[in-house]
């Protein structure tokens, strides 16, 4: 009986289990679940696609609802231009995939701008959702990235029109309506945008894009596309957004990095940290919180307290619940753009400390800026900007000068970072200037290459240069001379050479050493103020160092007469001055070239002419005989006082300093026609008629023009003048031989006397040493043989004894 009862109970349980299993299959079972993962390969391609689509779920919709939704949605084909645009974007236009997030946030900002402007005239515009924010959420499990804004949203018609056709962003049409409605004609350039183009960049990282949008004048709709076609349908969940748009990206496998919180945060800070509206990212952090203690721990603590505090137990009216501290991972919205763009505020409202803090944050520098300027430019293009001059020159400032792009100027369009990858935002010589430019008139173009050619960018560049030069000009003289010029003086000189339109402004910023002060530098304005009466030229002398320049024979008479001479000691200096035709109406005169003349009285003029006539025989002898192939002409000098002679370049020839620089160029091959032309030009040989060497030469050639000693002396004087004038000798050995010959004559040594020959050393007798070595080797060999024979002798002796 008992066995029957147990058997019946088992049957009932089996029946119940079978019925329950049937119920579960009927409710939630699918073919895929029944087959299991082990039969994945038996599915058809259509089944796999269907299952992948069902895995893409929106909040509040399960797989079957999503499938039903797709079946009922209205299908559309993209406009032909849209297909071409998407292919262009995906294949080539966007070189950097990460900008998709910048574009989506920019679109969200435009939508928020719209609703905020509408709310100024419509109090009910924000009733659906008073928040004006952008929120970004990553869903690693479902491979989804959500970007949600509470902007104006889109109606069904706008979803089809704006996302299915190109150049129909909705924003431009919106601006037209607002312009017509405004009576005062106030500009609404804040709202300019190109939603239709930037939106398609989402397909750079997404296989599928789902847009859920709610407009105040329509119900909530869902737009979905895989880049081939799109569909639109009313959202069966109803109004879940209140107002605004959520863009959901089903990321490609290779784009999974964009589901990492650190990646998203860095992109937001890089491109969108100055957007006008708060941007939040759904992120986690670890917090220490208090939780109720477990019952056993609480009971134990209560017992201990009861033993220790039995005396006061009656006085406690209520007992607090026992808790403990634990670490938990808490998820919340984290604000990413807490730094507000100070360039959008009036400069009068920004404190100096704020500029310094912004500069350090923006440039990643630890030092304060040397100078800054905050301005708003208006006219053909309107933009706001803050520019900074760093305290010290960036490392490698002139490495690859001209070919390396400057990335110190960051371009924003409506607070959206566009790029810092520019070659032409600032001229090359201002490549040390750092700053931001924010324009509302530039388009949010999809290509920085296209933007680079935009005509408004050239206008911006022109204004940036002018403002930068104004900023530099306002740096205090002491700070300018001691700090700025040491760090960036070469840049200003290069600017004089390269920037024709701003050459006059840049010339006022130049600083040079001069004979006026042994250490201080001077400006050209200060030089002109100190010029002597009737002085019509600015005199300068170029050399490898100040010592070389101020000891040059070319400056002797100028310094003696009290004229100030500018010393050019940097390789770029002479190029810089050559690029300046004049300064303040005064032309520049290189004192190492022809053209140096002094104001002279009639008496002085007569004396000079008499001297020239006196030395005419020597001058002709030098030109036609002694130095026939070496000089263009020989003249009596007006610039020499101590030196016997000097070699002077023509007005369009190379000075000694310039020739040395040109021949030292790394790319110099000797085949350049212009270089060879300048280098081969003959020069003028100037003599000092008051020098004893010159006067004695005049006496000697009058006695004998063919005197070999005088001929040698003339050549040595020429070669010495070549060196003292800064030029290089083509044959230094011949120069050395002539100097030696002159020294022999001065010491009464026969010029043809030969150098004494060294006595030949007798070779060392190595025969005895060799024989001795051979004997030692033979003895050593004999010893070795004897040592080898000893064991044999011992063995024989032992045998004999036996």
UniProtKB/Swiss-Prot annotation:
This is Endoplasmin. Phosphorylated by CK2. N-glycosylated cotranslationally at Asn-217 by STT3A-containing OST-A complex: this glycosylation is constitutive. In response to various stress, 5 additional facultative sites (Asn-62, Asn-107, Asn-445, Asn-481 and Asn-502) can be glycosylated post-translationally by STT3B-containing OST-B complex, leading to a hyperglycosylated form that is degraded by the ER-associated degradation (ERAD) pathway. In normal conditions, the OST-A complex together with CCDC134 prevent glycosylation at facultative sites during protein folding, thereby preventing hyperglycosylation. A motif (Prevents secretion from ER) lies at residues 799-802. It holds the Pfam family HSP90. Residues 289-317, 757-789 have a biased composition (Acidic residues). The SRT pseudosubstrate motif associates with STT3A during translation in normal conditions, preventing glycosylation of facultative sites until HSP90B1 folding is completed. The modification N6-(2-hydroxyisobutyryl)lysine is found at residue 168. A motif (SRT pseudosubstrate motif) lies at residues 42-44. GO terms for molecular function: ATP binding; ATP hydrolysis activity; ATP-dependent protein folding chaperone; low-density lipoprotein particle receptor binding; protein phosphatase binding; protein phosphatase inhibitor activity; RNA binding; unfolded protein binding. Its main location: endoplasmic reticulum. Residues 790-802 have a biased composition (Basic and acidic residues). Glycans are attached at residues 62, 107, 217, 445, 481, 502. ATP binds at residues 107, 149, 162, 199.
């Amino acid at each position: 009986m008992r066995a029957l009862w147990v058997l019946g109970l088992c049957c009932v349980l089996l029946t119940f289990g079978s019925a329950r299993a049937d119920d579960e299959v009927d409710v939630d079972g699918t073919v895929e679940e029944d087959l299991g993962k082990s039969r994945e390969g038996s599915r058809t391609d259509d089944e796999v696609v269907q299952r992948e689509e069902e895995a893409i779920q929106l909040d509040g919709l399960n797989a079957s609802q999503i499938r039903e939704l797709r079946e009922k949605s209205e299908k559309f084909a993209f406009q032909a231009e849209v297909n071409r645009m998407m292919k262009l974007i995906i294949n080539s236009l966007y070189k950097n995939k990460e900008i998709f997030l910048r574009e989506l946030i920019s679109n969200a900002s435009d939508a928020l701008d719209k609703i905020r402007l509408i709310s100024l005239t419509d109090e009910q515009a924000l009733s659906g959702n008073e928040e004006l924010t952008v929120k970004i959420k990553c869903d690693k499990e479902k491979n989804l990235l959500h970007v949600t804004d509470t902007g104006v949203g889109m109606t069904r018609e706008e979803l089809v029109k704006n996302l299915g056709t190109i150049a129909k962003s909705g924003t431009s049409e919106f601006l037209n309506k607002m312009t017509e409605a405004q009576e005062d004609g106030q500009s609404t350039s804040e709202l300019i945008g190109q939603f239709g183009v930037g939106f398609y960049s989402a397909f750079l990282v997404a296989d599928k894009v789902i847009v859920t949008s709610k407009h105040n004048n329509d119900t909530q709709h869902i737009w979905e596309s895989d880049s081939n076609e799109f569909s639109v349908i009313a959202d069966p969940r109803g109004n879940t957004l209140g107002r605004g748009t959520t863009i959901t990206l089903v990321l490609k496998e290779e784009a999974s990095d964009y589901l990492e919180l650190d990646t998203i945060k860095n992109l937001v800070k890089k491109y969108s940290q100055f957007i006008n509206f708060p941007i939040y990212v759904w992120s986690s952090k670890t917090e220490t919180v208090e939780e109720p203690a477990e019952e056993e721990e609480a009971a134990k603590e209560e017992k201990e307290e009861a033993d220790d505090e039995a005396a006061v137990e009656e006085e406690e009216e209520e007992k607090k619940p026992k808790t403990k501290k634990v670490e938990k991972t808490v998820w919340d919205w984290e604000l990413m753009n807490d730094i507000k763009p100070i360039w959008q505020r009036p400069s009068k409202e920004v404190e100096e400390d704020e500029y310094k803090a912004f500069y350090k944050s923006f440039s990643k520098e630890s030092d304060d800026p040397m100078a800054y300027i905050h301005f708003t430019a208006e006219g053909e293009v309107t933009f706001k900007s803050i520019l900074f001059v760093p305290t010290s020159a960036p490392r490698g400032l002139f490495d690859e000068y001209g070919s390396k792009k400057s990335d110190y100027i960051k371009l924003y369009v409506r607070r959206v970072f566009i790029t810092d990858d520019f070659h032409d935002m600032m001229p090359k010589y201002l490549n040390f200037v750092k700053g931001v430019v924010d324009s509302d008139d530039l388009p949010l173009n999809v290509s920085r290459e296209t933007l680079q050619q935009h005509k408004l960018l050239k206008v911006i560049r022109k204004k940036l240069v002018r403002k930068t030069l104004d900023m530099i000009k306002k740096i205090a003289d002491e700070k300018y001379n001691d700090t700025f010029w040491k760090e960036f003086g070469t840049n200003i000189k290069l600017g004089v050479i390269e920037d024709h339109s701003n050459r006059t402004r840049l010339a006022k910023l130049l600083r040079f050493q001069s004979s006026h002060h042994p250490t201080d530098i001077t400006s050209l304005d200060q030089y002109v103020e100190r010029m002597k009466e009737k002085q019509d030229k600015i005199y300068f002398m170029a050399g490898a160092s100040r010592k070389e320049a101020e000891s040059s024979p070319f400056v002797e008479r100028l310094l003696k007469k009290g004229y100030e001479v500018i010393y050019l000691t940097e390789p770029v200096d002479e190029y810089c001055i050559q690029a300046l035709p004049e300064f303040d109406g005064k032309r520049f005169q290189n004192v190492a070239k022809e053209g140096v003349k002094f104001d002279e009285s009639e008496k002085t003029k007569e004396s000079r002419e008499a001297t020239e006539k006196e030395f005419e025989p020597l001058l002709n002898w030098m030109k036609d005989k002694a130095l026939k192939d070496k000089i263009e002409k020989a003249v009596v000098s007006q610039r020499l006082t101590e030196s016997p002679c000097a070699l002077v370049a023509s007005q369009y020839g190379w000075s000694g300093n310039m020739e040395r620089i040109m021949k030292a160029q790394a790319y110099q091959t000797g085949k350049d026609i212009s270089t060879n032309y300048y280098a081969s030009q003959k020069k003028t040989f100037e003599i000092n008629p008051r020098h004893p060497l010159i006067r004695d030469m005049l006496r000697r050639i009058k006695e004998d023009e063919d005197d070999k000693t005088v001929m040698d002396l003339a050549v040595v004087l020429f070669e010495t003048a070549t060196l003292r004038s800064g030029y290089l000798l083509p044959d230094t050995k011949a120069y050395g031989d002539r100097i030696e010959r002159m020294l022999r004559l001065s010491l009464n040594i026969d010029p043809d006397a030969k150098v004494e020959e060294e006595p030949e050393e007798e070779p060392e007798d190595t025969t005895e040493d060799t024989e001795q070595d051979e004997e030692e080797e033979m003895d050593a060999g004999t010893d070795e043989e004897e040592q080898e024979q000893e064991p044999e002798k011992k063995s024989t002796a032992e045998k004999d004894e036996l």
